[in-house]
Amino acid sequence: MTDTPLSRTPRASLPEEFHLAWDTLNGLTGEPAFVEVFATAPAVLRFVMNDFYARLFFGGEVDNRFKQLARLRLSREHGCRTCNKQNVPGALQAGISQAQIDAIDDCEAGPFNEAEKAVLAFADQVALTNMQGDLSDALYARLSAHFSDADICELGTVMAVIAGMAKLSFVLRLVEKESYCPFVPPEAPA
């Protein structure tokens, strides 16, 4: 269980509209803290679940498979164990193979097509761990061979929201971290 200092709303006290999100998150990760904490701000939780996930991540113009690849690459790079627990099944459900999941940390050498490699390279630029992230001319050429500028904006927005939500989840202590997670708060003074 996470050790967030924020108030949590148990499932029995959640509005009905959030039950599916709680059930899904708890079923995949065993840790529904995100839903329980953000239920205290229902408009924000609705934004995340309905506007971001339903309309943009699972909707939008770009094939969800590319968004799933980017999301998994970011969660692996950021070291979010809770995220990885839900993103691996999401990737598999979107048609990403186990071989691709296993190779996602070395995507240029992995079993990815050129469009997938371009998206993963873009994710590496958006990652919170990359302070020099940039859409170089070379990366833009790789992406634009497969995606319109509107698609690139959609992919970038999806990645930015996912990265930002991961960082917020780390700060609020809503998620478990992998042993290699680079986001570790300083030791509290004695």
Regions found by a protein language model. Name each.
Residues 116-157:
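Acidic/histidine-rich alpha-helical segments that form the ligand environment
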Residues 81-115:
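Helix-adjacent hinge/juxtasegments
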Residues 44-49, 79-83, 129-137:
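Short acidic alpha-helix initiation/capping motifs at coil-to-helix transition points
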Residues 171-190:
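Acidic, carboxylate-rich catalytic segments that either coordinate divalent cations
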Residues 1-66, 92, 187-190:
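Mobile cap/lid helix-loop segments that border enzyme active or cofactor-binding sites
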Residues 46-60, 99-106, 137-145:
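Short amphipathic alpha-helical segments and their helix-coil junctions
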Residues 69-86, 153-170:
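N-terminal hydrophobic signal/anchor transmembrane helix of membrane proteins
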Residues 62-63, 95-98, 148-149:
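Helix N-cap / loop-to-helix initiation motif
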